[in-house]
Swiss-Prot record:
GO MF term list: oxidoreductase activity, acting on paired donors, with incorporation or reduction of molecular oxygen; oxidoreductase activity, acting on paired donors, with oxidation of a pair of donors resulting in the reduction of molecular oxygen to two molecules of water
Organism from which the protein derives: Haematococcus lacustris
A GO biological process held by the record: carotenoid biosynthetic process
Pfam families to which the protein is assigned, alphabetical: FA_desaturase
Name used for this protein in its record: Beta-carotene 4-ketolase 3
UniProt gene name: BKT3
């Protein structure tokens, strides 16, 4: 499909579902529109994207992720039986009698599948929180929007929603500025030091206290400590790295050279993935379509592929 044809189809669909301009005006009084200080911001595209005409899909998406995560989490914590010795290892599901001979442990295939799905759903919890910080779960109901964001980030790792909200908008208002953007590196753009500084800037003793309380509650309800370490610690940590790598490091990474540590990576320099829509979703719920996210910060995650087609950036060959 040619880019022009794709744009015409997308624009017609957008116009049909367009919301009142009052919605965007109300949004702009609570959040921040991006800077238009460079031609690279492509100011002509400022009004190309129209948000959904209803909050129903955003709310449904959020509730679906919360509900699915809850079901998989409870299964992982209370029903998975992790092996405690090499003798209990088995790759494929077996009969109940054979499982008892193996100490009742779950198969490695079962454990791996649950871990992979749960880690992906942890990522979905954070992406939903991120949408809440942009007001895009429910554009027309700020209280419901923030309630859902609070629920998601508490289930994710008990981060402080208000603190995340404040720092995230510091990121949008000072994108790629060392010392001003809390998501940016602190002078060393290497992957490991950047990730370490990124995570440490959002953690707190109060968060760890709440995580410890939550772990105690789970144990009192019968959850094995090993399950908590695998499914309540390792899974969200891996999810955090996924979010950082595809949503911060790759989009905002400075170019090579001796001045890399001092380069300003303004929002309009953000990179956008060339992955297909399906791969972009599986990678990080479209968080890798990052130029579009900064161009239209009032677009929910599930409309970022549409935004990419509007922008014409990062299109895969099939759409070029």
């Amino acid at each position: 499909m040619h880019v022009a044809s794709a744009l015409m189809v997308e624009q017609k669909g957008s116009e049909a579902a367009a919301s009142s301009p009052d919605v965007l005006r109300a949004w702009a009084t609570q959040y921040h529109m991006p800077s238009e200080s460079s031609d690279a911001a492509r100011p002509a595209l400022k009004h190309a994207y129209k948000p959904p005409a209803s909050d129903a899909k955003g709310i449904t998406m959020a509730l679906t992720i919360i509900g699915t995560w809850t079901a998989v989490f409870l299964h992982a914590i209370f029903q998975i039986r992790l092996p405690t010795s090499m003798d209990q290892l088995h790759w494929l599901p077996v009969s109940e009698a054979t499982a008892q001979l193996l100490g009742g442990s779950s198969s490695l295939l079962h454990i791996a599948a649950v871990f992979i799905v749960l880690e992906f759903l942890y990522t979905g919890l954070f992406i939903t929180t991120h949408d809440a910080m942009h007001g895009t779960i429910a554009l027309r109901n700020r209280q419901l929007n923030d309630l859902l964001g609070n629920i998601c980030i508490s289930l994710y790792a008990w981060f402080d929603y208000s603190m995340l909200h404040r720092k995230h908008w510091e990121h949008h208002n000072h994108t790629g500025e060392v010392g001003k953007d809390p998501d940016f590196h602190k002078g060393n753009p290497g992957l490991v030091p950047w990730f370490a500084s990124f995570m440490s800037s959002y953690m707190s003793l109060w968060q760890f206290a709440r995580l410890a309380w939550w772990a105690v509650v789970m144990q009192m309800l019968g959850a094995p400590m090993a399950n908590l370490l695998v499914f309540m610690a390792a899974a969200p940590i891996l999810s955090a790295f996924r979010l950082f790598y595809f949503g911060t490091y790759l989009p905002h990474k400075p170019g090579p050279g001796p001045a890399a540590g001092s380069q300003v990576m303004a929002w309009f320099r953000a990179k956008t993935s060339e992955a297909s829509d399906v791969m972009s979703f599986l990678t990080c719920y479209h968080f890798d379509l990052h130029w579009e996210h900064h161009r239209w910060p009032f677009a929910p995650w599930w409309q970022l592929p549409h935004c990419r087609r509007l922008s014409g950036r990062g299109l895969v060959p099939a759409l070029a």
